[in-house]
């Protein structure tokens, strides 16, 4: 009856016998992971770190040292530079570097003033002269910054900050080449040395 039931289900006697032998095999029982092996006591350091890892961390030769402050400053500047600078803006700065700039205050046109009464009060005169000097410097800066003549004062100052970062980066790039006698008088080397950097 049992043999007929096994045959009806499509299971032969050899399969049943092999299955029963495999269940009682000591080798298989040793290979199967036990439930308590999968649990970890997170309060014990030995479960988290092996002795080799602990020895590695305690070795003073493997301690990480902080980089010098100068390196950190350069890294911060490069990160800000990469965020603020795109390829088109960088090409615009490259072209502006090779263009001559006239920053003579006498050649900077002054804005037309309306006919207003000028006070003779000493404090008013000093304040007016201070504002005139600031306005003159802003007009000169607009001629230096690429595209600054078409910007308002706030946008031009933001562009001046980015342009200054670009120029500082160019100085750092060209300093090693100036020590080996590179012809730095030619502005075209700015593009060459910049593009040759990794």
From Swiss-Prot:
Any one Pfam family match given in the protein's UniProt record, by short name: HLH
Classification via PROSITE patterns: BHLH
Claim: Transcription regulation is one of the keywords in the record: yes
Induction section of the entry: By FUL, which restrict its expression to the margins.
Record GO biological process: polar nucleus fusion; regulation of DNA-templated transcription
Result after altering residue 141 to F: In ind-1; defects in margin definition, especially at the fruit base
GO molecular function, one term: protein dimerization activity
Disulfide bonds: none
Task of the protein: Transcription regulator required for seed dispersal. Involved in the differentiation of all three cell types required for fruit dehiscence. Acts as the key regulator in a network including SHP and ALC that controls specification of the valve margin. Works with ALC, SHP, and FUL to allow differentiation of the lignified valve layer, the spring-loaded mechanism of fruit that promotes opening. Regulates the expression of the YJ80 marker.
Identification of the protein by name: Transcription factor IND
Gene that produces this protein: IND
